[in-house]
Every structure is written in structure tokens, then in C-alpha cells.
Amino acid sequence: MSKKEKREQKIRENVKNVSLEDFEWLINQYGYIKMGGSHSVAVIKNTSYAYPRKNPMGQPYVKRLIEIIDNR
């Protein structure tokens, strides 16, 4: 298992404790980030998803990101 796969697995297994850095790393694996004011927008395929830039990331934001990735 590569480092990338391990990092993604760690995020998926513990959605309660995900840092902003890990959250944005996961976005960049599947899409890109549009920076804004207090919120940024993750763009994965044809789906846009706004999220607050705070550390650690809230559990609902992480779950929704994983759902978007799995359904792409």
C-alpha cells in the first residue's frame, strides 16, 4: 500500500479528526480547490462543494467529501 493510499485510508477511517491539510490533500487527489474568503470550494468532476477553512474539519464536511468522491 502506497503512502497516498494509507493517508486516504486514515482519513476515511477517522472522519472525526481530520486536519484542514489532510482534507485539502484529499480534494487535490480527485479535483481542485477554488480559494475564497472564509470558505473555499472543492471542485471534483462536475460537483462543487463549499467548505469552511477551519482546523480540524467538521465531521459532516468530511463525510460529504468522501460521498462525492465515491459517487464520481
Short names for language-model regions:
Residues 24, 28, 35, 59, ...:
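General N-terminal targeting signals
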Residues 15-18, 41-43, 62:
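Extended aliphatic helical segments
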Residues 9-12, 53-54:
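Short histidine-centered catalytic/ligand-binding loop motif
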Residues 11-30:
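Polyanion-binding surface elements
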Residues 26-48, 54:
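A short, structured beta-strand/loop element
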Residues 2, 46-72:
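Long, intrinsically disordered, low-complexity Ser/Thr/Pro-rich regulatory/activation regions
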Residues 1-8:
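A short, surface-exposed helix-loop junction/capping segment
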